[in-house]
Amino acid sequence: MAPDTRPHALPHAVSRLRAARLARSSKPFLARGGPHGERCAGCRLVPSHCLCSLRPMVPTQAGVCLIMADIEPLKPSNTGWLIADVVADTAAFGWTRTSADPTLLAMLADPQWQPYLVFPGEFVAPERVVTTLIACNRATQPTAGPPQGGLAPSGGRDPRSGGAWGQSAKRPLFVLLDATWPEARKMFRKSPYLNHLPVLSLESEHISRYRLRRSRRDDHFCTSEVAALCLDLAGETLASQTLEAYLDVFTHHYLRAKNQLLVDGGDAAHMRLQALRLPGGATISPSL
C-alpha cells in the first residue's frame, strides 16, 4: 500500500476532545447519515474528499470556548471543529450536569478575557442580556498568566482581521454551547458556574445556510455560524468571513462525499475561501 502523503491538520481542542471521548466509548460511534467508511483524522471526511489542505487559520484577538454536549465532538457534521480550525484560540470542554472542568473555570476567571455566554436573550433575565461587547480594561485587574491548559495571549495577527482590542483591553471570549437546541437549553439551565456571565444575544437578519442537519426554524444557526457572527461583532472581519466561507466549503465536501460525487474545487465556495486566505496560507487546488 502506498504511503498516505495527504497533508493532515494538527490536532486542535475539538480533535483532542473527540479523541478523549472515543477513548471512553465501549463501542464504536456510528454516525447517522453522511458518508461511510474510513475518515480522515484531520477533517472527519472520507480521504477522497479530505479538507485538510484547505484549512485556513486566521490570527484573532477574540477567543472561542466551546462547551460541548456528550456526543457532539463525535459527529462528523459538527461545526465546532471548523471554528477550532480557523481560530487558534479555541478551547473545547465536554459538558456534564454534575461538575465543571477546573480548566474551564480558570479560563472564565482569567483576567485577560471578558467572557460572554452566547444565547438567545428571549430565554434570559433582561438584566443579564447584552447585544454589544463590553469595553473592559484589564489594567486595573489583578495580573495572572493563562491557566494550565487554557488559552495563551494571541501573537501577531493579520491587519485585515480588524479586531479593535489593544494590549490593555480584555479580549472577548465567546462561550458557545455546542449541542442540539433542546440540549443547549438544558445545558444553559443546569450550568450554575455560567450564571455570572453576561449573555450575548445576537441579532441577525440572515437565514442559516447550514444544510447538514434539519432545524424547524431558519433563525437557528449552527455553531460555526454563531461564531462567525460573534467574530464580526468583535471587529474580526477576516476571521468571520473566512469561517463563513469555510463552512460552505466543508458542506460542499461533505455532501459530495455523501452522494459519491467528485469535489468541484472551482466552485464559488472554494473561490471565496481562496480570495480570503492569508498571505502564505494554503492554496486551494481545483484539481482535488
Regions found by a protein language model. Give the residues of each.
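C-terminal folded domains that constitute the principal catalytic or ligand-binding module
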Residues: 173-174, 181-288
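S-adenosyl-L-methionine/SAH cofactor-binding core of RNA-modifying enzymes
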Residues: 88-185, 189
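Short cysteine/histidine-rich zinc-coordinating motifs and their immediately flanking basic loops
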Residues: 51-66
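Short hydrophobic beta-strand segments
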Residues: 63-70, 114-119
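Short cysteine-rich clusters marking metal-coordination/redox-active sites
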Residues: 40-43
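Histidine-anchored nucleotide/phosphate-binding helix
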Residues: 74-86
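Short Cys/His-rich Zn2+-coordinating modules
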Residues: 16-33
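Short metal-coordination and nucleic-acid-contact micro-motifs, chiefly zinc-binding Cys/His arrays
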Residues: 36, 46, 60
